[in-house]
Amino acid sequence: MSIHIGAQQGQIAETILLPGDPLRAKYIAETFLEGAECYNNVRGMLGFTGTYKGKRVSVQGTGMGVPSISIYANELMQSYGVQNLIRVGTCGAIQEDIKVRDVIIAMSASSESQTNRLLFDQIDFAPTANFELLHKAYQVATERNLPVKVGNIFTSDSFYRESLDLYKKLASYQVLAIEMESSALYTLAAKYKRNALSILTVSDHILTGEETSADERQSTFNEMIEVALDAALIK
């Protein structure tokens, strides 16, 4: 057991999906995994392990933001030996050619979080995805004719931002979308020499105000999960 995860050794698979919402973790386990069993409910942050196409896979809720995902990613890698971590979540687009319901695969993750600045003595570390996972996820998405974009995203510490000036600036530098966790996940995966990837569904467009309905989000979410699980089969 670790501080925030109540699993015993061996209960968590080497490959894990990481939604922010613990109820999404439960949904993934019940919908996509065979023989799924709950290994964690500490603080209500549910975790499950089952099989997908014969491969053992876990899914663990992480909560929202850099501090929360950092806790779970650290403990999963340090205490349970997890090797492959795939974040599955939502994001807000900031490019004109990206529409709601599109899928974004994060090649890298810029951030305003001070976590890496403190860690690297004020230099700008560039958190980057594992190429093998990224390449496989892109192949799977394109084979299924899903609208997918690959590029840099921005991990924000602020959900309710008063001004969009920063996001407009980031858009001019080809940043695709905004979310709140990936830079921390990629940094920790680099630290532990593990493999990480973020696959995100566009739930809204920050600059145009376009949004998806709950039903639309669920449909696209299912497609994204299948991409993540099939990409995970290579590891």
UniProtKB/Swiss-Prot annotation:
Homohexamer; trimer of homodimers. GO terms for biological process: purine nucleoside catabolic process. One of its GO terms (molecular function) is purine-nucleoside phosphorylase activity. Its EC number is 2.4.2.1. GO terms for cellular component: cytosol. PROSITE patterns: PNP_UDP_1 (PS01232). This is Purine nucleoside phosphorylase DeoD-type. Keywords: Glycosyltransferase, Transferase. Phosphate binds at G20, R24, R43, R87, V88, G89, T90. The record marks R217 as: Important for catalytic activity. It comes from Brevibacillus brevis (strain 47 / JCM 6285 / NBRC 100599). The keyword Membrane does not apply. Catalyzes the reversible phosphorolytic breakdown of the N-glycosidic bond in the beta-(deoxy)ribonucleoside molecules, with the formation of the corresponding free purine bases and pentose-1-phosphate. It catalyses: a purine D-ribonucleoside + phosphate = a purine nucleobase + alpha-D-ribose 1-phosphate; a purine 2'-deoxy-D-ribonucleoside + phosphate = a purine nucleobase + 2-deoxy-alpha-D-ribose 1-phosphate. The active site is at D204. It comes from the Bacteria. InterPro entries: DeoD-type, Nucleoside_phosphorylase_CS, Nucleoside_phosphorylase_d, Nucleoside_phosphorylase_sf. The gene is deoD. Belongs to the PNP/UDP phosphorylase family. A purine D-ribonucleoside binds at H4, E179, M180, E181, S203, D204. Pfam families: PNP_UDP_1.
